[in-house]
Regions:
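N-terminal domain-start signal
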Residues: 1-321
Length: 321
């Protein structure tokens, strides 16, 4: 019998009432200034009420998410798909620092297992076998690649692909349909983003194939060939897949495409609003909160940089509730 999470879901249902709706986001966009936006967030209970800095408020909201997960006493395996990108960020930083010294990675995430400082130590000492299994091969390849070619971009794609492969594997292993679907969407959307960037920068088909991670909803061989062939061919291939809406967004603008990518993932988790017993609603809530924070960051950045409301509106993400 599948594990049930009746108490945890009941708690999440009460917290969902505090999530920003599309209407709340519109109200935030409508405030006049950046300072007004900060006050709006504080009135909604964001931060501790003491911060006047956007980064401090958003960091505090992120901390609240993981404090809640800890409070609900849920196994970490259910959130691997969300924590893996932080782990591989740490690996990327550690590899570059081990070869070229201080790099533009001012932050190692320490709230991961293993921690950022531990990954840094293992890579520095070339103790790759002590890294998590999915990292070992990527760490070796990335170090060797950077050492012999000095190509930081090649180092990045080796680690980014390994991260996506780990996300796909974790999604299947978690035993939850929402986590599996989220992982699949995450990998596919990342592959599409990679293909789009590669097409725009004229990368070779071999480079594109090396950068893409296998997933069930895309044929990455066809995706790579389409990206190499050109923008029209790439949109044509996507129009044949479950990501056909992405082809339309891609034709509109880069910001429309980025927005579509995030909205696609939110739509994947929306059915969890009607689940009552599985881990799904808890995971969906965490994803929804992360999306909410990202959207607020976009709005605050727009206010700070004097963008029009319409320009900000084009960039905001769809909300979960």
């Amino acid at each position: 019998m599948a594990e049930q999470f009746v108490y945890q879901v009941a708690r999440i249902r009460s917290l969902e009432l505090q999530l920003f709706s599309d209407q709340t986001v519109e109200q935030l966009i409508a405030v006049q200034t950046y300072d007004d936006a900060i006050r709006f967030l504080q009135e909604k209970g964001w931060g501790t009420g003491q911060e006047n800095d956007a980064d401090a408020i958003l960091d505090r909201e992120n901390e609240k998410i993981w404090a809640l997960v800890k409070e609900l006493n849920i196994e970490g395996k259910y959130f691997d798909v969300l924590s893996l990108p932080k782990q591989y960020h740490n690996l990327k930083a550690a590899v570059k620092e081990s070869i070229v010294g201080e790099v533009d990675f001012p932050l190692y995430y320490e709230d991961t297992e293993p921690s950022g400082s531990k990954i840094k130590e293992l890579v520095r000492d070339k103790e790759y076998d002590k890294l998590p299994e999915g990292m070992r091969k990527a760490a070796r390849e990335a170090v060797e690649s950077l050492l012999h070619t000095g190509d930081g971009q090649l180092c990045d794609i080796i680690i980014d692909r390994a991260c996506l492969e780990a996300v796909e594997k974790a999604g299947k292993k978690a035993g939850s349909s929402v986590i599996r679907d989220y992982a699949e969407s995450t990998v596919a959307v990342a592959d599409i983003k990679t293909a789009v960037r590669a097409q725009k920068t004229g990368k070779s088909v071999d480079f594109i194939k090396r950068a893409l991670a296998e997933c069930e909803t895309l044929d990455i061989q066809r995706l790579a060939k389409a990206a190499f062939a050109g923008a029209e061919e790439l949109r044509s291939y996507l129009s044949e897949t479950v990501y056909s809406d992405g082809a339309n967004a891609l034709a509109q603008s880069p910001s429309a495409f980025e927005r579509w990518c995030d909205n696609r993932i939110i739509r994947t988790i929306k059915p969890q609003k009607y689940e009552s017993f599985t881990i799904g609603p808890v995971v969906a809530y965490v994803i929804a909160r992360l999306n909410e924070i990202k959207t607020v960051r976009i709005i605050l950045s727009g206010k700070l940089n004097g963008l029009t409301d319409e320009s900000i509106r084009e960039r905001v993400r769809e909300m979960y509730v």
